From Swiss-Prot:
This is Photosystem II CP47 reaction center protein. It comes from Trieres chinensis (Marine centric diatom). Belongs to the PsbB/PsbC family. PsbB subfamily. One of its GO terms (molecular function) is electron transporter, transferring electrons within the cyclic electron transport pathway of photosynthesis activity. It is a multi-pass membrane protein. PSII is composed of 1 copy each of membrane proteins PsbA, PsbB, PsbC, PsbD, PsbE, PsbF, PsbH, PsbI, PsbJ, PsbK, PsbL, PsbM, PsbT, PsbX, PsbY, PsbZ, Psb30/Ycf12, at least 3 peripheral proteins of the oxygen-evolving complex and a large number of cofactors. It forms dimeric complexes. GO terms for cellular component: chloroplast thylakoid membrane; photosystem II. Its main location: plastid. The keyword NAD does not apply. Keywords: Chlorophyll, Chloroplast, Chromophore, Membrane, Photosynthesis, Photosystem II, Plastid, Thylakoid, Transmembrane, Transmembrane helix. One of its GO terms (biological process) is photosynthetic electron transport in photosystem II. Pfam families: PSII (PF00421).
């Protein structure tokens, strides 16, 4: 009998040996993809400028996840932080990628073995000789092992007790590096931006999982609960597993999009809310004001701003600016950033300082408007010059640059002032190389946007998968046919009212 494509998994429904085989093959595919993708990214990655051309600008997807776990060095002699390294060993990008590919090959061979040798004594009930799995016991084993792994990650890897630690950075993503993290056991551990919570929660969840696993290994479920939740049905396992996966996908979609200690901006790029709230702009202004209050000139104050911090304050790095269906890395949009030109300050002929109103995230075009400190519009680039009152030419706007490549330079000609006013709409002003990658000028999203979009969609699909398989396993007896007790109810002439047990007729002799 031929099976339609959506029914092919029926063949492993009552075949534990081959159920293991297909799971091993799935693990082989996942590990093989991860290792191969890492090697591909390493082949195209340019490590020369970690400040203005970081991995998230280049569209790296696997590398940020490797880096946040403590992998920073390459066999090519470079490091994510820009330093040169020698003999990084196995704990390197290439070493971990190759170990995944080797694991993939081993799982592939194991899958073939289990497919061929599917009928093992292990899978048969010794009392009946029938294929049978003790699913509650298997659940306990898995829970115990995953708890052990969770505890080990939190207690050893993250804390640096036996491992490198994780990627930790400051609130503005400037000073990040891999370092050991002490667990935060207080209320502060629940702050999503506190890396100490990662260590504490893995330790706590791991201990809980270990004890829960031991409980399920030693305590049998009550018969009523066993039957109510269909604990003997393999499709119950599928349904609950899908629930765990879609829940994890929903949670990580949130931590990725809104930001968290687990998704540092140095590795995944800034969040859209940091642009929306002027997060970096406010910090830059605070640092400049502090420097000026210390006696530095405005030019010196702006020169102290790190290029890395200024680059975050640019709309092209906002993951919400790139359309979801614009393929390619951010660098294919606006180009490869080469230099910060500095902070432009505009002035009209009366000497008033003017600020260009910044473009909101969801606008493709936005009027160029220059306002004074009170928010009053003093200049603009008009749509119709014939009716203009506040044009750059009429108001006599000039622009001075502080910090960056154009530090100390002043521009007075209207075309140049307009050019920089348009650039200032997008945040801090940068120089881009658009020829090397044939960049088209259309913004792209960062790996942060792609991850969120993908996992939110997968979570939704898996949610429906959970409902589907949960419904199938709970109502299995209804779907598989009519039971013996139902036959009497619907027998013609047995009841005055069909199917109503209270109207049973007296049998004639």
């Amino acid at each position: 009998m031929a099976l339609p494509w959506y029914r092919v998994h029926t063949v492993v429904l009552n075949d534990p040996g081959r159920l293991i085989a297909v799971h091993l093959m799935h693990t082989a595919l996942v590990a093989g993809w991860a290792g191969s993708m890492a090697l591909y990214e390493l082949a195209v990655f340019d490590p020369s400028d970690p400040v203005l051309n970081p991995m998230w600008r280049q569209g790296m997807f696997v590398m940020p996840f490797m880096t946040r776990l403590g992998i920073t060095d390459s066999w090519g002699g470079w490091s994510i932080t820009g330093e040169s390294v020698s003999n990084p060993g196995i704990w390197s990008f290439e070493g971990v990628a190759l170990s995944h590919i080797i694991l993939s090959g081993m799982c592939f061979l194991a899958a073939i073995w289990h497919w061929v040798y599917w009928d093992l004594e292990l899978f048969r009930d010794p009392r009946t000789g029938e294929p049978a799995l003790d699913l509650p016991k298997i659940f306990g084993i898995h829970l115990f092992l995953s708890g052990l792994l969770c505890f080990g990650f939190g207690a050893f890897h993250v804390t640096g007790l036996f491992g490198p630690g994780i990627w930790v950075s400051d609130a503005y993503g400037v000073t990040g590096k891999v370092q050991p993290v002490a667990p935060a056991w207080g209320a502060d551990g629940f702050n999503p931006f506190n890396p100490g919570g990662i260590a504490a929660h893995h330790i706590a969840a791991g201990i809980f999982g270990i004890f829960a696993g031991i409980f399920h290994l030693t305590v049998r479920p009550p018969q009523r609960l066993y039957r109510a939740l269909r604990m003997g049905n393999i499709e119950t396992v599928l349904s609950s597993s899908i629930a765990a996966v879609f829940f994890a996908a929903f949670v990580t979609s949130g931590t990725m999009w809104y930001g968290a200690a687990a998704t540092p901006i140095e590795l995944f790029g800034p969040t859209r809310y940091q642009w929306d709230s002027g997060y970096f702009q406010q910090e830059i202004e605070r640092q400049v004001e502090t420097s000026v209050s210390e006696g530095l000139s405005e030019s010196q104050a702006w020169s102290r701003i790190p290029d890395k911090l200024a680059f975050y304050d640019y709309i092209g790095n906002n993951p919400a600016k790139g359309g979801l269906f614009r393929a390619g890395p951010m660098n294919k949009g606006d180009g490869i950033a080469e230099a910060w030109l500095g902070h432009p300050i505009f002035r009209d002929k009366d000497g008033r300082e003017l600020t260009v109103r910044r473009m909101p995230a969801f606008f493709e075009t936005f009027p160029v408007i220059l306002v004074d400190k009170d928010g009053i519009i003093r200049a603009d680039i008009p749509f119709r010059r014939a009716e203009s009152k506040y044009s750059i030419e009429q108001v006599g706007v000039t622009v001075d640059f502080y910090g960056g490549k154009l530090n100390g330079q002043t521009f007075k000609d209207a075309p140049t002032v307009k050019k920089f006013a348009r650039k200032a709409q997008l945040g801090e002003v940068f120089e881009f190389d658009r020829t090397s990658l044939e960049s088209d000028g259309v913004f792209r999203s960062s790996p942060r946007g792609w991850y969120t979009f993908g996992h939110a969609n997968f979570a939704l699909l898996f949610f429906f998968g959970h409902l589907w398989h949960g419904g199938r396993t709970i109502f299995r007896d209804v779907f598989t046919g009519i039971g013996a007790e139902v036959t009497e109810q619907v027998e013609f002439g047995a009841f005055q009212k069909l199917g109503d047990k209270s109207t049973k007729k007296q049998g004639a002799v």
